[in-house]
């Protein structure tokens, strides 16, 4: 019984560490694929030129709202799984 709790606590710690470490790269990637592009301004003397540079990784306007929810669901899983494991440990 004690060894089972140690395994569960170890799983919980590893899960949280990996989850927290991967959270920022996931947010960065989602921001990358949901941004259609950027505006670039070039100033040469008195001439100002603005151009739009499209993002080749853009998922499209219809998919962007769904993809932008990925970090939210990831955060929910990161909260719910440890809560369930902690409840099972507490219950035993």
Curated annotation (Swiss-Prot):
Top-rank taxon of the source lineage equals Viruses
Select a single GO molecular function from the record's annotations and give it. structural molecule activity
Q: Which InterPro entries match?
A: VP1_VP3
- How is it placed in the membrane, per its record? Multi-pass membrane protein
- Residue ranges crossing the lipid bilayer per the database entry: 8-28, 65-85
Q: Does the keyword Membrane apply?
A: yes
Entry keyword Transmembrane helix: yes
Subcellular location, in the record's words? Virion membrane
- Cellular-component GO terms for this entry: membrane; viral capsid; virion membrane
Enumerate the UniProt keywords alphabetically. Capsid protein, Membrane, Transmembrane, Transmembrane helix, Virion
Q: Of which family is this protein a member?
A: Belongs to the fuselloviridae capsid protein VP1/VP3 family.
Write the protein's name. Answer: Structural protein VP3
UniProt lists the gene as: VP3
């Amino acid at each position: 019984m004690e060894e089972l709790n140690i395994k569960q606590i170890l799983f919980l710690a590893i899960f949280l560490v990996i989850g927290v470490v991967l959270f920022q790269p996931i947010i960065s990637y989602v921001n990358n694929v949901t941004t259609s592009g950027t505006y670039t301004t070039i100033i040469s003397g008195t001439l100002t030129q603005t151009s739009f540079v499209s993002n080749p990784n853009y998922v499209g306007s219809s998919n962007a709202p769904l993809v932008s929810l990925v970090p939210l669901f990831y955060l929910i899983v990161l909260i719910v799984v440890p809560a369930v494991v902690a409840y099972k440990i507490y219950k035993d």
